[in-house]
Every structure is written in structure tokens, then in C-alpha cells.
């Protein structure tokens, strides 16, 4: 019976199956980690939500700005993204500058639909955006103000996603080169001399490049055009020769060039500059001035952005305000000075920082350094699209100012919001950075939102990206994970934000460090960007500390600048890492014993966790890392209490809480919904009536979550042993028990849609009355012609009956008369019903129907020409089967090759059969030893342990056991944090102190091995075998989705060969190499048949089909269609090609007799009809045109 025990804060309702655990503690795992983290991991979805908050300037952002101003830290941008854009574009003036239009104070109304409504009815989750527009007529001084609707603006859901047309999407953050000034060094091709260059790169606008060439002359390149003298450029921007000489008095290289310069005035310099940039136009001083202004000094054309100003200030030691986003004379002078210092080999350069004179280090820039690469988050990406849309709108406004009557103009009449809406819609719908959210499991969703991509508009392309860009860089430490990246062409271009990483207002990733003062490690934590790392000595998190926070050793392993890690005296250490998992991403931090896995396998393990399918019954891992709770908690897939209170009502789909402040909160649970990846999205309550909950505590689990912990797979009993060759080459043998008990079963939900449209020949109709279809085929349809809920369906079954009017020839007068008398009844229709595709089966779990009448009543929107839309949801219960892919968390993947009866599996001495047999040869060459250590620790966690069972009280390994981990009951989940896990000697000690079973036996020895017995003979195996519990995942690569066979199917239009692929009901390609194989065997007739009858001999295949049906001998083959295509291609090259028979007579290759339909009719059957499994719709030729 359940007992209730009350502590100060939480009422714990303990049930017999839950070992008295508190479901709401951060994690109830026994943690073997020795390092205490001074701070918590930042909110995992903050990379998405914080950025969007800034864009729309909501309350959360305002609260952060207030706090920032109070602290004086300047870590939040103080102008919202929308305000920035509208301020930039205002005022829009006409060409005569007599009228102006100004925008201010954008705001949002409430969203029209809830998130749930948008998902159900295919809407976009958005809110109407309004802005105050003010039109001023300069001639009359009249001012007109209006609030203008700027379109529906997509909003972010609370979990960092967008709902666009009913589907959940994620905007991925982009990694791009930061605006700023960059210095480089290159070898001159001809003279082997080093040439130094500088580039000033803005956020928007023309590049400005300086160079000191092989003749030591300072040169400039304006907007990527021809090189010219830098002195001329300085004169063109308004400096006199004496001012240049004064500014560069300590730089002889510039003074030499100044002396050689023949031009004397600014006008001459402007003409010279213009002549070289625009050689075709007439050069005048005015044209030169206008050109330079439009390139570099017009704020609408040239924008450094706050980040560009920040980078220039830092690099050159100038002190301009961060909001000053234009280029100045001082920046250009400082750039040339720095370039000369670099050329002269100087070590330092005088500059200013925070009002003090400092010596800056002179060095070339590494473009792959994270101090020079920044993140464009979702807010900035949408802001850039908005800017593009508004600049298109600006053109329309200017035109309308000139064409409309000045008296009648209002802001509304000037503004056309279509270009703004179009750019935003295009971005969300088609941009490379707007991705279909990966909803396979909670981890895949969180990782998708934390992804960093170097691809996309303004980024790199995967074809041209070099090895250097893809490689792991020292500055990635604590910012981007060195492990998690795709295998394939995108490797290194797509990464994942590190666990503790966060993005600052300039878009640079920061990572936290603990401050160290005179060898004492404080709990004060400072976030740093990558360029600040270089200035400090940083010790690793594993450095041993005493209880007062002082270093135990005299020296510490630390990193200094870009060099390898070195031992330094503790007195010189400035900072220390906050946690060993700081370096890796969330996905990699979920792999226990990651430190014992080789890099490539860790990468595969990380990626495969995202492909794990949520099982019917989730089970959290016995061996975890302590990150599981956080991954599930921040995923948005659990339901958390908003306030402290007491649960008053619990059912499968609703939880009601009476809050302490007297209010009541209701929480709706999602039940058996379809995710983007067709997996089953279902939430289950884990609280009880009368239970006390605190704000933020988990009340309901989502898919692949158990008790608030991420639970992607199952803990299974594994033996590392070969078995009759069935687990050769990564194959896996599993026990029939996993099938019978639904241990690895999952539910998959497919959605099928059909609509009835208005065609030119009349309306399509949803009906049960279908032509040429027997009663048994429509037995499961209701009177409307729609399948009943609960029906078991398989490939070819009708889900929704639909008929479409057939195309008709011109009617004779007699027929028209009959039509007029007897009405439309004799009109012919075709069956175009929705059928279950080939290879699919399942149970109908839901039907949604929207008709034109319902839509108008509810305010729903059906597409034009559609009268009725029906969706059918079919759930499949998929048991584990031969061909499915299983994997551990260490890149140890395999395909199931055999399912053995439980009685044939090897068993332990107490009769327990193992669940899975893995090949031990999969471990040594792959070097992922983490799986073996996990196996041993899994056995320890399953059995329970008590270190006092070891008689040696002074054993060294006992000193490494943290307090609280001295003993545990069976089935206690344990945590072994990455890079701070259980040491091998501790594992060995714990294996010798596991709790004995009820017979008093220890089945597994201190070496982690046990004697197994052959299930078939009962004989023991000769050698002991490694046995233990490992966490196994069922991956989304399921054999049911891949297996496929073709009967009679569609053919390619041109070649008349069968199509390929499961989706097209295609055949298997008999390719070039297969042809060689048959040639090698001399199988001439088989080869001939493959290349004619079974492929594209149109006439022949019809005859063969007829002969098989009638039981006749097979006729000889005809001419393949592809041969005719070859002839046609040669004729198109004006080559006259003839085909001769054996007698040398030309054969007429006309196509008249090649009509397959006529041949088929002669034989008395219809080759065009395909079995129900393949018949989605009839031939395309009969398809009616839609209005």
C-alpha cells in the first residue's frame, strides 16, 4: 500500500515500484563525480528565446534591460530589433525632400489563434504588427498620423519554435565572419616577399582594403576595384598633405610615399580616384565625392553594426561609441598605422582601452578564431529579412509620393506591406536556415534549436569550404562542441553550442570561468569571449582543490594563449574552467565514459541518440551522466507547475492545481499526437491527487522521458560473445522476450490527406458509392465514404472514397437530348479514392474533416477550389524485428540479424537469460571502450553495492568514492559525468562489493565476467564472458519503412523503364556492374531478358504478361525503347542512323505499332490497371484540370 511521508517542502508519495524516490528533485542519481559546479547550466533554449525577445522588444527583454542598466554591465542591447529597423528607415523622403514619412513605436496585438489551434488547422502562429506612421508635407507644414497594419508577424512559441502553416519549424543560428578590421600576411608570388594587407569589412556596404605591396608602397582598394595609392585616398577623404604628415610623423614608410605623391589638392585626388573606380564615366570632383560618400559615409548604405564598431575599437585601440556605426577618418588612419607596424615587425601598438593608454599586441588575424566569427541568431536573421522588405517598400513609398496628389496623401495610401510580408514568408518557408523541426525525441528537438550552421545565405557553401574552416579550433573550447557534427559533406560546417555557452549582444559566444585570486579559486564566475581567452592563464576544471578552494599542487595544467597546455605555477593562474563538461554539447554530455571513447565513435554516438525512437514504455538509463534531467526539463516536452500549490485533479489529459495564492491552474496534456518524424507524441501525468508541487517541478512526462529524466532507450542485459556467426560484422542477436513484452516496441502515426476540388468538369465528390468496387472494399467506410475510427487497414484499403468527373468527348444531339430528359445520372466518374500506400498497415485513430460550410462558420481557411478536406491518422504498433537498427551510446550500432527464443539464449548461473549478444570484435578496433565500462557499471547499478563488504578498510579505491555513494539498493540509477567519471579501479572495487542475489551468490566476478550456460544444451561456456546492463536505443531506421517489392508499377515516360525507389513503387536497378556479372557467367538469355522484357521492351512485356496469364510459351523479345531513344538522340545530332536486319535490309522503326494499349486490347486485358497497393490515381492523361 502507498504510504505518505511529509518533509518540510515536499509530500512524497512512495509506491512499491518507485523505491521511495522524490520525483521532483533535480536528479536522484547517485553521482560519482568529484567536481562541484559553481553555476548551473544556462537555459538550454535561451539561444533561441532571448534573441526573439530582443527582436520584438517584449516584457522579458525589457526586464533584462532594466537589470542590465542597474548593474551597469552592458550585456544586453538596449534598443529592440524592430525599433532599430524602423529607426533606420525613417524618414523616407521624396526626391525633392519636401515630404517625409516616419515610423515609430511598433507594437503587437494579441495572436489570432493559440499554438494548439495553429497546429490543428494548419495556420501560422502569428500576431498582427502595427506601427505609428507620420506623414509630413514640408510645403504646407501639415502632419498626418495613422496607425498602420504591417502584416501578420510570426511569433515564437514558448519553446523557441515557429508554427508555419501548421508545421513546427526552427530557425538555426548562423556562424558568419564578424564585421571589423582584419590583417593578413601573404607571400608575393614573384618576389617571395611578404605582403601585408588590411580589410575593413562592414555589416552592410563596400569593403575597404589596404595593402603594403612588395615595393613598400601603401595601396588602397575601394570596393574590390583597382589598387591605387593610399595617400590619394587620404587626400580624397579631406586630409591635406600637412595633416597626413602630422598624423604619420612616426611612420617613415607613409612619409616616403607622401613625398613621392604629385597630386596636391582634394579635388585632384577625388578626380584621380573616380577615374580608377569608374573609368567609363567623366571624372569630376563632385562625382568622386558623391561616390565616396555613398560607399563609406552614408549611414543608409554603409553600416558597421555595433559589433563592427566593437571589433574596430578592440583591434585598433580607438574609443568611439558602440552605437556609432559609421566609418571615420580616425579609423582609417589607425588601420594604416597598425598595418605599417605589422609590416615593420613591431610587437606592440599604442592604443586606448577604457580611457587608459595601453600597448596592443600586433599580429595577423585568424579568420577561423571564434573571436572573429559570430552568431547570427534568429532575431537578427528575421531583422535582416524585415530590413530587406522595408527597403523594397521604401521604393514604392517614394514612387507614390511623386505620383499621388499631395493634399490627399495619408500614411496608409503610401504604404504597401506586400513586399515586407513576402520577404518574411519566403524566409520562414524556403530559407536554408528555416528547418523542419526534428521532433524524433526531446534531445533531437533541443539539439536542433542549439545548432550552429556556417551554411546559408551570407555563409559558406559546402563545396568550397576548406579543411581549415571545418577543423576543430582551440577557441571552440566551451563555445562549440568538438564532437557533435554530422558525418558527410557538412562535417565541421554544422556544430552544436557547448553546454555552458551563451551568446552576448554582439553575437560572440561566451563561456564561463571561475576567477582565481593568488592561487585561491573563488566562486565568482565571469563569462568571456574567445579573444579575451588569449590574455589569461586558465586552469582546467579537474585541477585538485582542498576544501577551502586552494590548489593542492604547486603547479597547475593550464592553457596560455594559443599554445599547448603547459604546467604553470598556481600563483600565475587567473581563471579556471567551471566544469569538465564545459567543452562538449548537451548531446555529447549524455554519453557516460565519453573520455574512454575515440572521437569518431563519440560523434556517431551523439548523432544516434537524436535518432532514438520513443518507446511505448520509457525507461531512464541506469548509467547516466547527470545531464539527463536538464535535457528533459528544458526540452519543452514535460509539463511543469507554474506556481507552488496542491494537485486537485489528475486524469490522462488534464491536471488541475490549486495554487498557494488562491488561483487555479489547469494543464492540458498532449495525447497520441503525430510528431514531425511520425513518432507518437504523448504525455503522461506523474503526480497524484493531493500531492504538493513547487513552481518548476515536473508534473507530466513527455515522449522518451521517465520521471523527468531523459529516457531514450532501455537497460538490457548484454553479453559480449559471438554466437554461431550470427553477430558477425556488427550484427546483433536479441531475445524473443524483447518482442513478446513489447520492450522495444514503438508507436508511429502516419497522416494521409485528400481533398475534393472543383474541376472544370464539375465537382469531385466524397462518397461511398464508387464505380467497379465491391461491397467488401467499402465495408469499413461510413455513409459519408470515410473510414471508421478503429478500423484495421492494410496496403490498398480505401480510406476515403472519392469520385472525379471523367473527361468526355463532344456529345451528339441525341445524347444531349437524353441528358436533358434523364438529368446528370448517366455522367461518368472515375474512382480517385485515398488508399493506404503499399507497405503500410495500422489502425485508424483519428479523422479530421473540414468542409467549405464549416470553414466559413469557424473562420477557417480552405485553399481556393477545395470544397472539402479530410485527414486520416493511422497508428502502427511496431515491434522490434529482424533488420531494425539498434545502437548503444558509444557509436556501437548494429542491425538485428536473428531473434532467438528466450530458452535458446545463454543464461547466467541463476537462470536469467541475456537479452542481447554483441560481438566482442566490435570493441578493440573501434576503440570505444566506454561501452565496456558502461556494461560493468550497469551491472553494479542493477545489483546494488555496499563498499563495507570489502574487508580491506584501507583500500585505495574507497578514497575515490564520493560521500553518499558508499552503498545503494538494487536498480539505483547512477551518474558518471563526462571527464569526471568513475575510475577503472573504482569499478573493479565496486564489482567485488555488489550485493549478492537471493541465493547469496555474486553472479559477476571482480573482472566483470560471469560463467554463462548455453541455452540449447545447458552446458557452461568454456571461458567467462563479460555480462552487464547497457542502455540500448532503437533507431529510426526501421526495416518496415525500407522493405519494398514491386509488382506491376509505373514506367518512366521517355525510356519506358520502371521507376526507382519505394515512393514511386519502383523496381531494383539492374545496373552496369550487375550486367558484367551476368556476362561473366555467360548467362546470355537471362541477360537478354533483363534488358528487354523485364525493362523497356514495351510490346514484349505486354505479350509476356499475356502468355503468362494464358499459360502459353513466352514470345521472343522486341526492340527496347531505350534503343529507339538512342537513335532519336543521334538523329538530333544530324546523324542519319539506320537499323539493318540479318539480311542487311533496313528495318522501319516507326512507332505506330508500339502503342502498348492497342496490343493489350488485342490480348483482351488491361495492362494499365495496377493492383490496389500501387493504384494511387489513374493515368495522368485523364487527370482533370483544376480551376
From Swiss-Prot:
<keyword id="KW-0808">Transferase</keyword>
<comment type="similarity">
    <text>Belongs to the RNA polymerase beta chain family.</text>
</comment>
<dbReference type="Pfam" id="PF04561">
    <property type="entry name" value="RNA_pol_Rpb2_2"/>
</dbReference>
<dbReference type="InterPro" id="IPR015712">
    <property type="entry name" value="DNA-dir_RNA_pol_su2"/>
</dbReference>
<dbReference type="GO" id="GO:0006351">
    <property type="term" value="P:DNA-templated transcription"/>
</dbReference>
<dbReference type="Pfam" id="PF04565">
    <property type="entry name" value="RNA_pol_Rpb2_3"/>
</dbReference>
<dbReference type="InterPro" id="IPR007645">
    <property type="entry name" value="RNA_pol_Rpb2_3"/>
</dbReference>
<dbReference type="InterPro" id="IPR007642">
    <property type="entry name" value="RNA_pol_Rpb2_2"/>
</dbReference>
<dbReference type="InterPro" id="IPR037033">
    <property type="entry name" value="DNA-dir_RNAP_su2_hyb_sf"/>
</dbReference>
<dbReference type="InterPro" id="IPR042107">
    <property type="entry name" value="DNA-dir_RNA_pol_bsu_ext_1_sf"/>
</dbReference>
<dbReference type="GO" id="GO:0000428">
    <property type="term" value="C:DNA-directed RNA polymerase complex"/>
</dbReference>
<comment type="subunit">
    <text>The RNAP catalytic core consists of 2 alpha, 1 beta, 1 beta' and 1 omega subunit. When a sigma factor is associated with the core the holoenzyme is formed, which can initiate transcription.</text>
</comment>
<dbReference type="Pfam" id="PF00562">
    <property type="entry name" value="RNA_pol_Rpb2_6"/>
</dbReference>
<keyword id="KW-0548">Nucleotidyltransferase</keyword>
<comment type="function">
    <text>DNA-dependent RNA polymerase catalyzes the transcription of DNA into RNA using the four ribonucleoside triphosphates as substrates.</text>
</comment>
<dbReference type="Pfam" id="PF04560">
    <property type="entry name" value="RNA_pol_Rpb2_7"/>
</dbReference>
<protein>
    <recommendedName>
        <fullName>DNA-directed RNA polymerase subunit beta</fullName>
        <ecNumber>2.7.7.6</ecNumber>
    </recommendedName>
</protein>
<dbReference type="Pfam" id="PF04563">
    <property type="entry name" value="RNA_pol_Rpb2_1"/>
</dbReference>
<dbReference type="GO" id="GO:0003899">
    <property type="term" value="F:DNA-directed RNA polymerase activity"/>
</dbReference>
<dbReference type="InterPro" id="IPR007121">
    <property type="entry name" value="RNA_pol_bsu_CS"/>
</dbReference>
<dbReference type="InterPro" id="IPR014724">
    <property type="entry name" value="RNA_pol_RPB2_OB-fold"/>
</dbReference>
<dbReference type="InterPro" id="IPR010243">
    <property type="entry name" value="RNA_pol_bsu_bac"/>
</dbReference>
<dbReference type="InterPro" id="IPR019462">
    <property type="entry name" value="DNA-dir_RNA_pol_bsu_external_1"/>
</dbReference>
<feature type="compositionally biased region" description="Basic and acidic residues">
    <location>
        <begin position="1173"/>
        <end position="1187"/>
    </location>
</feature>
<dbReference type="Pfam" id="PF10385">
    <property type="entry name" value="RNA_pol_Rpb2_45"/>
</dbReference>
<keyword id="KW-0804">Transcription</keyword>
<dbReference type="GO" id="GO:0003677">
    <property type="term" value="F:DNA binding"/>
</dbReference>
<dbReference type="GO" id="GO:0032549">
    <property type="term" value="F:ribonucleoside binding"/>
</dbReference>
<dbReference type="InterPro" id="IPR037034">
    <property type="entry name" value="RNA_pol_Rpb2_2_sf"/>
</dbReference>
<dbReference type="InterPro" id="IPR007120">
    <property type="entry name" value="DNA-dir_RNAP_su2_dom"/>
</dbReference>
<dbReference type="InterPro" id="IPR007644">
    <property type="entry name" value="RNA_pol_bsu_protrusion"/>
</dbReference>
<keyword id="KW-0240">DNA-directed RNA polymerase</keyword>
<feature type="region of interest" description="Disordered">
    <location>
        <begin position="1150"/>
        <end position="1187"/>
    </location>
</feature>
<dbReference type="InterPro" id="IPR007641">
    <property type="entry name" value="RNA_pol_Rpb2_7"/>
</dbReference>
Amino acid at each position: 500500500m502507498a504510504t505518505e511521508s511529509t518533509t518540510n517542502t515536499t509530500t512524497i508519495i512512495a509506491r512499491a515500484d518507485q523505491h521511495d524516490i522524490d520525483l521532483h528533485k533535480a536528479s536522484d542519481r547517485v553521482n560519482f563525480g568529484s567536481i562541484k559546479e559553481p553555476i548551473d547550466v544556462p537555459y538550454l533554449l535561451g539561444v533561441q528565446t532571448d534573441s526573439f525577445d530582443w527582436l520584438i522588444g517584449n516584457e522579458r527583454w525589457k526586464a533584462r534591460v532594466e537589470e542590465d542598466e542597474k548593474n551597469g554591465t552592458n550585456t544586453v542591447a538596449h534598443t529592440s530589433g524592430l525599433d532599430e529597423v524602423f529607426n533606420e528607415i525613417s524618414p523616407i523622403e521624396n526626391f525633392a525632400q519636401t515630404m517625409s514619412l516616419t515610423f515609430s513605436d511598433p507594437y503587437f496585438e494579441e495572436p489570432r489563434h493559440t499554438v494548439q489551434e495553429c497546429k490543428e488547422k494548419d495556420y501560422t502562429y502569428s500576431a498582427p504588427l502595427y506601427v505609428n506612421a507620420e506623414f509630413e508635407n514640408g510645403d504646407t507644414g501639415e502632419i498626418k498620423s495613422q496607425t498602420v497594419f504591417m502584416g501578420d508577424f510570426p511569433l515564437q512559441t514558448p519553446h523557441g519554435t515557429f508554427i508555419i502553416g501548421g508545421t513546427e519549424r526552427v530557425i538555426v543560428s548562423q556562424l558568419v565572419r564578424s564585421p571589423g578590421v582584419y590583417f593578413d600576411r601573404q607571400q608575393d608570388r614573384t618576389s617571395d616577399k611578404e605582403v601585408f594587407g588590411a580589410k575593413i569589412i562592414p555589416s552592410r556596404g563596400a569593403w575597404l582594403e589596404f595593402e603594403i605591396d612588395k615595393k613598400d608602397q601603401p595601396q588602397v582598394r575601394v570596393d574590390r576595384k583597382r589598387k591605387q595609392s593610399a595617400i590619394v585616398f587620404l587626400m580624397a577623404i579631406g586630409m591635406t598633405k600637412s595633416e597626413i604628415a602630422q598624423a604619420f610623423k612616426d611612420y617613415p614608410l607613409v612619409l616616403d610615399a607622401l613625398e613621392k605623391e604629385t597630386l596636391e589638392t582634394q579635388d585632384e585626388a577625388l578626380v584621380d580616384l573616380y577615374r580608377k573606380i569608374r573609368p567609363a564615366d567623366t571624372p569630376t570632383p563632385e562625382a568622386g565625392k558623391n561616390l565616396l560618400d555613398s560607399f563609406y559615409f552614408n549611414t543608409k548604405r554603409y553600416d558597421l553594426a555595433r559589433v563592427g564598431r566593437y571589433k574596430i575599437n578592440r583591434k585598433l585601440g580607438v574609443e568611439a561609441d558602440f552605437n556609432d556605426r559609421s566609418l571615420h577618418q580616425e579609423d582609417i588612419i589607425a588601420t594604416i598605422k597598425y598595418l605599417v607596424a605589422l609590416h615593420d615587425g613591431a610587437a606592440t601598438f599604442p592604443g586606448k582601452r577604457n580611457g587608459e593608454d595601453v600597448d596592443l599586441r600586433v599580429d595577423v588575424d585568424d579568420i577561423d578564431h571564434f573571436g572573429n566569427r559570430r552568431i547570427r541568431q534568429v532575431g537578427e536573421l528575421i531583422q535582416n529579412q524585415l530590413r530587406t522588405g522595408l527597403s523594397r517598400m521604401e521604393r514604392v513609398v517614394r514612387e507614390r509620393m511623386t505620383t499621388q496628389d499631395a493634399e490627399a496623401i495619408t500614411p496608409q495610401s503610401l504604404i504597401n506591406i506586400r513586399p515586407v510580408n513576402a520577404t518574411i514568408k519566403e524566409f520562414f518557408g524556403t530559407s536554408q536556415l528555416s528547418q523542419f523541426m526534428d521532433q524524433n525525441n526531446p534531445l533531437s528537438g533541443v539539439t536542433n534549436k542549439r545548432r550552429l550552421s556556417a551554411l546559408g545565405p551570407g555563409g559558406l557553401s559546402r563545396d568550397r569550404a576548406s579543411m581549415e574552416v571545418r577543423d576543430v579550433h582551440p577557441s571552440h573550447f566551451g563555445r562549440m562542441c568538438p564532437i557533435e557534427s554530422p558525418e558527410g559533406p557538412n562535417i565541421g560546417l554544422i556544430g552544436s553550442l557547448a553546454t555552458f555557452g551563451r551568446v552576448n549582444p554582439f553575437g560572440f559566444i561566451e563561456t564561463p570561468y571561475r576567477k582565481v585570486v593568488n592561487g585561491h579559486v573563488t566562486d565568482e564566475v565571469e563569462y568571456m569571449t574567445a579573444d579575451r581567452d588569449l590574455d589569461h592563464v586558465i586552469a582546467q576544471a579537474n585541477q585538485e582543490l582542498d576544501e577551502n578552494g586552494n590548489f593542492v599542487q604547486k603547479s597547475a595544467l593550464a592553457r596560455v594563449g594559443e599554445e599547448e597546455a603547459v604546467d604553470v605555477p598556481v600563483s600565475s593562474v587567473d581563471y579556471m574552467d567551471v566544469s569538465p563538461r564545459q567543452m562538449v554539447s548537451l548531446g555529447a554530455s549524455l554519453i557516460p565514459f565519453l573520455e574512454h571513447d575515440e572521437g569518431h565513435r563519440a560523434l556517431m554516438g551523439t548523432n544516434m541518440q537524436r535518432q532514438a525512437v520513443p518507446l511505448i514504455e520509457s525507461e531512464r538509463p541506469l548509467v547516466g551522466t547527470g545531464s539527463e534531467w536538464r535535457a528533459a526539463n528544458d526540452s519543452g516536452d514535460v509539463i511543469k507547475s507554474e506556481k507552488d500549490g496542491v494537485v486537485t485533479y489528475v486524469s490522462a489529459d488534464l491536471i488541475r492545481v490549486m495554487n498557494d495564492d488562491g488561483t487555479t491552474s489547469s494543464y492540458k496534456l498532449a495525447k497520441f499526437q503525430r510528431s514531425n518524424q511520425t513518432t507518437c507524441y504523448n504525455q503522461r501525468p506523474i503526480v497524484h491527487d493531493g500531492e504538493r508541487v513547487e513552481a518548476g517541478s515536473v508534473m507530466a512526462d513527455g515522449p522518451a522521458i521517465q520521471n523527468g529524466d531523459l529516457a531514450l532507450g532501455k537497460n538490457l542485459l548484454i553479453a559480449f560473445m559471438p554466437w554461431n556467426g550470427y553477430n558477425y560484422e556488427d550484427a546483433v542477436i536479441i531475445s524473443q522476450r524483447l518482442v513478446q513484452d513489447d520492450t522495444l516496441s514503438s508507436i508511429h502515426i502516419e497522416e494521409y490527406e485528400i481533398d475534393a476540388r472543383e474541376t472544370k468538369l464539375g465537382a469531385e465528390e466524397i462518397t461511398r458509392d464508387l464505380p467497379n468496387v465491391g461491397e467488401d472494399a467499402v465495408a469499413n467506410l461510413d455513409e459519408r465514404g470515410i473510414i471508421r475510427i478503429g478500423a484495421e487497414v492494410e496496403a490498398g484499403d480505401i480510406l476515403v472514397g472519392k469520385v472525379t468527373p471523367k473527361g468526355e468527348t463532344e456529345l451528339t444531339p441525341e445524347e444531349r437530348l437524353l441528358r436533358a430528359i434523364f438529368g446528370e445520372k448517366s455522367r461518368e466518374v472515375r474512382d480517385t479514392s485515398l488508399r493506404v500506400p503499399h507497405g503500410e498497415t495500422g489502425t485508424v485513430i483519428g479523422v479530421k474533416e473540414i468542409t467549405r460550410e464549416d470553414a466559413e462558420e469557424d473562420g477557417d481557411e480552405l485553399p481556393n477550389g477545395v470544397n472539402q478536406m479530410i485527414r486520416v491518422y493511422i497508428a502502427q504498433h511496431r515491434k522490434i524485428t529482424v533488420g531494425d537498427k539498434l545502437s548503444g551510446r558509444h557509436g556501437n550500432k548494429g542491425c538485428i540479424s536473428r531473434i532467438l527464443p528466450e530458452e535458446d539464449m545463454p543464461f547466467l548461473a541463476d537462470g536469467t537469460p541475456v537479452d542481447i549478444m554483441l560481438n566482442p570484435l566490435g570493441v578493440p578496433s573501434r576503440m570505444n571502450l566506454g561501452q565496456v565500462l558502461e556494461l560493468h557499471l550497469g551491472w553494479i547499478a542493477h545489483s546494488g553495492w555496499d563498499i563495507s563488504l570489502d574487508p580491506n578498510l584501507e583500500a585505495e579505491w574507497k578514497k575515490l568514492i564520493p560521500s553518499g555513494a558508499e552503498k545503494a539498493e538494487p536498480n539505483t540509477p547512477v551518474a558518471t559525468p563526462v571527464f569526471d567519471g568513475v575510475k577503472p579501479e573504482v569499478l573493479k572495487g565496486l564489482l567485488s562489493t555488489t550485493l549478492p542475489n537471493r541465493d547469496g551468490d555474486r553472479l559477476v566476478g571482480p573482472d566483470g565476467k560471469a560463467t554463462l550456460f548455453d541455452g540449447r544444451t545447458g552446458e557452461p561456456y568454456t571461458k567467462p564472458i563479460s555480462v552487464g546492463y547497457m542502455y540500448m536505443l532503437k533507431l529510426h531506421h526501421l526495416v518496415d519503412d525500407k522493405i519494398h517489392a514491386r509488382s506491376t508499377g509505373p514506367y518512366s515516360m521517355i525510356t519506358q523503364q520502371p521507376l526507382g525507389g519505394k515512393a514511386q513503387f519502383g523496381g531494383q536497378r539492374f545496373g552496369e556492374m550487375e550486367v558484367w556479372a551476368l556476362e561473366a557467367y555467360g548467362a546470355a538469355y537471362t541477360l537478354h531478358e533483363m534488358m528487354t522484357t523485364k525493362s523497356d521492351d514495351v510490346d514484349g512485356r505486354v505479350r509476356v504478361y499475356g502468355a503468362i496469364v494464358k499459360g502459353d510459351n513466352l514470345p521472343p523479345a522486341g526492340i527496347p525503347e531505350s534503343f529507339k531513344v538512342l537513335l532519336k538522340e543521334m538523329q538530333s545530332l544530324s546523324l542519319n542512323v539506320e537499323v539493318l536486319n540479318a539480311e542487311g535490309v533496313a528495318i522501319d522503326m516507326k512507332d505506330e505499332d508500339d502503342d502498348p494499349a492497342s496490343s493489350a486490347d488485342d490480348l483482351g486485358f488491361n495492362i494499365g490497371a495496377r493492383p490496389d497497393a500501387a493504384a494511387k490515381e489513374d493515368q495522368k492523361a485523364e487527370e482533370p484540370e483544376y480551376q
